[in-house]
Structures are given as C-alpha cells and as structure tokens.
Amino acid sequence: MRNIVYFILTLFSLTSYALETINIEHGRVDPTPIAVNKFNADSSNNDLVGRDVVKVISNDLKISGLFRPISSASFIEEQTGIKYKPLFAAWRQINASLLVNGEVKTLENGKLKISFILWDTFLEKQLTGALFEVPTKLWRRAAHKIADKIYEKITGDPGYFDTKIVYVSESTVLPKIKRIALMDYDGANNKYLTNGKSLVLTPRFAHSADKIFYVSYATKSRALVYEKDLKTGKESVVGDFVGISFAPRFSPDGKKAVMSIAKNGSTHIYEIDLATKQLNKLTNGFGINTSPSYSPDGKKIVFNSDKNGVPQLYIMNSDGSDVQRISFGVGSYASPSWSPRGDYIAFTKIIRQDGEKTFNIGIMKAYPQDHGNSERIITSGYLVDSPCWSPNGRVIMFSKGWPSKANAPGKNKIFTIDLTGHNEREIITPADASDPEWSGILN
C-alpha cells in the first residue's frame, strides 16, 4: 500500500508475550474478549473517522471468529488515547483480556495519522502498536491494517483483512446480467469492472493485486482472456484461446500461467509464458483435465482429471512430469485450490446418491505421503463451489447456491469459513455473487 506510511509505535514497555497463541487448526476456539476503545481525535471530523475506524477494527476481529469485541456500553474507564497507561483493573472488571487504544490526527500535509496500542490487561503490558499515515480516503485500509496487526500478534499468523475480492456479480432480475466486480474482503467498496454486455467468467488476480484476468465471451463460441489494470482501468486481450472455459491461474512469480483448453474431444492443461506467449502442453492422453492451480513455490500443479473414469485430483510437477493421484474417496472432485501456506488443498466434492447430488467443500493434505485419511469436508449444500484461500491460508471463501422455489428465484452468494469448518459467514453483496478470488495482502 504505497499511499500508507507505517511505523511501529512503542510508548511503554513492549513485551514479546501475548495471550496463549490461538491455534485455529485445533477446532472451535473460545473467542478472546477484546475492548476497542474510542479513538482520540483532534477535530470533530476526525472524531467521526475515529468512530468508523473502531467499527471496522471491531468488525474485522469479530468476523475472524477468534475475538469477541465488548460493547462500549459496558466500558468503565472514560480516559482514551495512546499517551496514558490504562486503568487495567477497570478493563478486567468487564472481562476484557485485550484493550485497543488509539487516536486520529491530521498532519500538516493533510494526511491522517492513525495510531493504536494493543494492551494485555492481565499482564498490564503493551503487546504491540503502530501508526499509519494515510490519505483521508484510505482510513478504512488503515483500520484493516490495525486489525491485521492485532490478529497477527495474538494468533502468530498474518492477518487477512486488508485484502480485496474479485467475483462475478449477477443481477437478480431478468434479463440477468453478469459483471466482474471488486470489493473489500468484508463486502465494502463494491464496484463493477465490466459493463455486462457480454458473458464473463472466472476472474483471477495476477501475482499482485494490481491486475485481474477474466474470460469474456465475445460470441457464444469465442472466449477471450482479458487483462485489466485496476489502477488505470486499462484493459487488453491476453489471448484468443479456442476451447478455453476458465481464466488462467498465475505462477507465484507472475511469469507464467496455467489454463485448460479443449481440443479434438479432450481437454488438457497448458502453461503459457506471459512474456513470449508460448504455450506448453502439460497433460496427455484422453479425458478432461481442468482447474489447474500452482503450489506456493510454483514447483507443483494440482488439477482434476477424469482419465480414470471419475473426476479425481492429481498433482504433477510444473513441467507436467510425475503425475500422482491424491484423491481416493467416493464422488467426483473439482476446482482444487492450493493453500498459500502449501499445507492443504481445498476442493469441491460432488456425491451422487439415490438420484440426488450433494455438493461439498473439503480440504486435504497437499502431498501424497501425508494423505492417508487427511480428507475433511468442512461445509455442504445444494450447490457449494469455487473454494479459494485467504492469503494466510486460514480461511476459505466459496460460493453457495440455492434452488428456485415457486415464490422465489434461485440465488448465489459468497461465504467464508475457517479451515476447521467453523465460523461460516455470508459476505453481503448488492446482487447475486459467485466465483470469488481472494487477493494477497495489499501493498
């Protein structure tokens, strides 16, 4: 985030101690009670900004499922700001294990200075602190950054709040219009990136969050891959790939991308060098090979294939060698997505029984020697699909659909859930939403 200047803030004795580190892989955890106090301000306008900053921080921490923000109505101590040492007994009295104090000021250059300190009320120690210099319009991102710092200090994992989501928005009235849309991870600042004049599918971030790629059907049989610069708004055609049905996924270094292309009755995985535009076919034989996704180090690719009759998940080296099957359960597997941490692969699993189909989102260990009984279903529904990961590899976002009823049309929405299968939440969008893709942490 080049428009934000960040400094570590230490006003009191800083300790490396934190509350017992939260490990969300151990299943459901009791949320840590935290008080986000009113931020001091140097003007009435900044007082309003401070109130909004507190709301965003509290909402971020609540959404994570790991923190329980305490209502300000129960606060006893009236003093606010970062320049005083809190009356810790007053905060312990309302069962606040953690306390956030902060302030908002306007600098001579017109930017905002937003500062915070995180306190442990039982040890009576400062855990962390920082200040951010931001243009006024970026106050919300500074609030997300503060929540990220708090999350990281208490969990040991990077936060994921200062991120973006790109997805397909679909109007709920006829004729239905599909557009590529962009929003903050929590649904704020939603905006449309395409005009709805053509069918659009599978938006994907490039290796940075500055560009996206998506498939657009100029005609029913001709799909184009577009690149859109989110800073300038400029758009260009990457390629006219006959037979492509999904946008490419990009290598971690941003130099290559993988995609599936249908030719002569089979669908295969291809890698494209983005500089030379040279295509390299990675899979062979008959069958449908789709949904490729790179490992975080770029050395492996996971994909699904029906070459053995039923769609299953496979891993291969990034040059197409050493193909290994990694799924062995009952049902069909689809849309694999490799965790940024490298430890898990998320997937969609479809089970057919008694003429009915059940869709599931699951995770499994990423490498063959680890598989055993590692597969775990974390949510199910009429139509759940398109799992993608938060940049810290701790939360999965996916789309969920409901069927049409006599008095209501079907709908699609975006949800998040942690990797243990707890804390499922809907991300509110202006219209129906599907095919989400999560950015990395913004610069």
Swiss-Prot record:
Biological process, per Gene Ontology: cell division; protein import
Subcellular compartments: Periplasm
Signal as UniProt keyword: yes
Signal peptide feature range: 1-18
First-listed, main subcellular location of the protein, grouped into a coarse class: periplasm
Matching InterPro entries: 6-blade_b-propeller_TolB-like, PD40, Tol-Pal_TolB, TolB_N
This protein's GO CC annotations: periplasmic space
Key words, A-Z: Cell cycle, Cell division, Periplasm, Signal
Pfam families: PD40, TolB_N
Subunit structure of this chain's protein: The Tol-Pal system is composed of five core proteins: the inner membrane proteins TolA, TolQ and TolR, the periplasmic protein TolB and the outer membrane protein Pal. They form a network linking the inner and outer membranes and the peptidoglycan layer.
Function: Part of the Tol-Pal system, which plays a role in outer membrane invagination during cell division and is important for maintaining outer membrane integrity.
Family label: Belongs to the TolB family.
Name assigned to this protein: Tol-Pal system protein TolB
Native source species: Rickettsia prowazekii (strain Madrid E)
Organism taxonomic ancestry: Bacteria, Pseudomonadati, Pseudomonadota, Alphaproteobacteria, Rickettsiales
